[in-house]
């Protein structure tokens, strides 16, 4: 959960749960009632990196890490958007009350992709035309200066731009090689997962997942160049399978890594500068 305390006396001011309670309408994304994984059985979903703060709008904007169980089938869902919120999502809370303002889900995290990395607040015009686009909003006005939240939010290092006033999806494009996301619906931001990357609830069934493309070192934005800089790399791909049907209390995970294989990318290190307006690679 995310909590706020009074700095003078330590009193709890508010608390917001990163996995929806029964009073949250998004509770239904964890399957039909009676749920296989009600709130008290769910694991992980930690916002374990630093949030962005929009002081003008009074927003905390942050990412939520992977859930457990990791396989949607175990929770009684099919992994389609929106799935088992708020894992794999960017969330904006009113910092005064803890009320949810908006959310945007980037994937159903079956792979410990951890969507917790940099959210950078930028005001810029958009006219996306990246040749490797995974999706873009068809209603973008190229003459409008948008209030954005940008970054490569997860280990897969996909670059995103969202409207930070309401969480609207604007565009997404890959950086380093990944094989987990096929595309995004430009109007809704709904993801489509690559079929071969879907982790099933079948013990021992393996999937080769390529998404180890960034870690804790943060990306950066320069207003001088209007560029986002991502410290990406083409890390090894993981051969993953379900270890058990029950996440462990110690780690929260129920997936095992049986081997690693080289990424099909031509090089390991791949730092990149991306023009925020167009989504094109600068270098």
Locate each region found by the language model.
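Conserved beta-strand position repeated once per blade in WD40 beta-propeller domains
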Residues: 50, 118-121, 218
């Amino acid at each position: 959960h995310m909590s706020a305390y009074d700095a003078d006396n330590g009193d709890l001011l508010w608390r917001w749960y990163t996995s929806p309670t029964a009073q949250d309408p998004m509770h239904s994304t964890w399957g039909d009632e009676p749920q296989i994984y009600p709130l008290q059985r769910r694991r992980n979903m930690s916002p374990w990196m630093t949030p962005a703060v929009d002081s003008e709008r009074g927003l905390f904007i942050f990412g939520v890490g992977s859930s457990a169980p990791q396989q949607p089938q175990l929770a009684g869902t099919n992994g389609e958007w929106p799935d088992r919120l708020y894992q794999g999502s960017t969330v904006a809370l009113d910092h005064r009350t803890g009320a949810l303002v908006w959310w945007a889900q980037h994937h159903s995290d079956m792979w410990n992709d951890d969507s917790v990395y940099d959210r950078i607040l930028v005001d810029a015009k958009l006219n996306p035309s990246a040749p490797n686009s995974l999706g873009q909003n068809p209603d973008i006005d190229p003459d409008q200066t948008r209030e954005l939240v940008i970054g490569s939010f997860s280990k897969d290092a996909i670059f995103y731009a969202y409207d930070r006033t309401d969480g609207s999806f604007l565009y997404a494009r890959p950086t380093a090689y990944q094989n987990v996301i096929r595309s995004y619906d430009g109007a809704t931001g709904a993801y489509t997962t690559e079929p071969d990357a879907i982790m099933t609830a079948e013990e021992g069934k393996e999937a080769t997942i390529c998404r180890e493309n960034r870690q804790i070192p943060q990306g950066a934005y320069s207003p001088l160049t209007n560029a986002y800089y991502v410290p990406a790399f083409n890390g090894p791909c993981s051969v993953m399978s379900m270890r058990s049907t029950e996440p462990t209390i110690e780690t929260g995970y129920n997936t095992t890594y049986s081997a690693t294989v080289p990424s099909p990318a031509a090089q390991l290190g791949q730092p990149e500068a991306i023009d925020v307006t167009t989504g094109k690679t600068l270098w």
